[in-house]
């Protein structure tokens, strides 16, 4: 999705997963690629949060994508910052996951060459998406529910 937005709006994007791997490979953390998402979020979010503030203060545009953004991220920004932030959670419906699980698994490996995806089971994907959707609603976040065709045409303005 971030790549599509880059192509449409010519805005640069930052993959939080790339930041994660840079921090791990550079030795700036003892965390590993398989550390718990909660630990990785606690480590990465303060960095990402301050990048967002810097981008806004400099009146620049940046698309940030990744799963290491806490669902309660709004509490970390004043109204002045929040008015310039567009945040969306992506989730897939149970029906979509069941009908397209093989495609989901294959596409995940195309985007990020995963050495080990044994945790990418139908049950785990269903649970993760249900959790994502629930937390997005609980935190009053905008979300995109993929239910039919995976075609998202998002307007940033």
What are these regions (language model features)?
Residues 18-21, 69-70, 92-98, 151:
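Conserved nucleotide-binding/hydrolysis micro-motifs of P-loop NTPases
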Residues 11-13, 84-89, 143-145:
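Conserved beta-strand scaffold positions in the cores of enzyme catalytic domains, especially
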Residues 12, 61, 138-142:
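Residue-level detector of anion-binding/catalytic polar loops
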């Amino acid at each position: 999705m971030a790549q599509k937005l880059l192509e449409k709006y010519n805005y640069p994007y930052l993959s939080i997963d790339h930041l994660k791997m840079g921090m791990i490979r550079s030795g700036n953390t003892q965390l590993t690629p398989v550390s718990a998402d909660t630990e990785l979020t606690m480590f990465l979010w303060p960095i990402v949060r301050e990048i967002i503030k810097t981008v806004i203060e400099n009146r620049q545009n940046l698309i940030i994508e990744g799963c290491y953004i806490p669902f309660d991220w709004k509490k970390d920004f004043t109204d002045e910052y929040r008015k310039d932030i567009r945040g969306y959670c992506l989730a897939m419906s149970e029906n979509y996951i069941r009908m397209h699980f093989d495609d989901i698994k294959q596409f995940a490996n195309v985007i990020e060459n995963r050495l080990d995806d044994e945790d990418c089971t139908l049950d785990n994907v269903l649970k993760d998406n249900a959790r994502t959707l629930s937390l997005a609603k609980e935190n009053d976040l905008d979300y995109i529910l993929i239910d039919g065709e995976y075609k998202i045409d998002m307007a940033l303005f």
